[in-house]
Amino acid sequence: MSRRRVIQRRPIPPDPKYNSRLVTMIVRRIMRHGKKSVAYNIVYDAFKAIEERTDSDPLELFEKAVRNLTPLVEVKARRVGGATYQVPMEVRSDRGTTLALRWLVQYSRSRGGKTMAMKLANELMDAANETGSAIRKREETHKMAEANKAFAHYRY
């Protein structure tokens, strides 16, 4: 692994319907076995369900949900002289968004419901209202960081 320079990240293209990079990111997280069109259908159906239920713009609700889910701090394991400490670290914005989308998809999948689109729609609406499993995960992460504040000086 070369240590010479930082690798340029590939730009994420916006999705065709909403022209949003965030939508493309969640489609890529939902996609399984390379079936991107299926993933797009799931996301668009979820957005349609949100629009029918709330009579508001689904993209705004989605962005609000992701903002609510984005963690500010997380803990990373750091080994110091035979002991492993959970060191609280600030989360970069791109990592925060990635974690938010990961939790959103993970807890949507584990949720009860008929279709993945409905499960995703329900989890998105819960996240926008600051309830639901994904929000609980973010709160848990923040609590863990707060509990291990004493080890913050081990930051690297």
From Swiss-Prot:
InterPro entries: Ribosomal_uS7 (IPR000235), Ribosomal_uS7_bac/org-type (IPR005717), Ribosomal_uS7_CS (IPR020606), Ribosomal_uS7_dom (IPR023798), Ribosomal_uS7_dom_sf (IPR036823). GO terms for biological process: translation. Transmembrane segments: none annotated. One of its GO terms (molecular function) is structural constituent of ribosome. Keywords: Ribonucleoprotein, Ribosomal protein, RNA-binding, rRNA-binding, tRNA-binding. It comes from the Bacteria. One of its GO terms (cellular component) is small ribosomal subunit. One of the primary rRNA binding proteins, it binds directly to 16S rRNA where it nucleates assembly of the head domain of the 30S subunit. Is located at the subunit interface close to the decoding center, probably blocks exit of the E-site tRNA. NCBIfam families: rpsG_bact. Part of the 30S ribosomal subunit. Contacts proteins S9 and S11. Belongs to the universal ribosomal protein uS7 family. This is Small ribosomal subunit protein uS7. It comes from Trichodesmium erythraeum (strain IMS101). The lineage of its organism: Bacteria, Bacillati, Cyanobacteriota, Cyanophyceae, Oscillatoriophycideae.
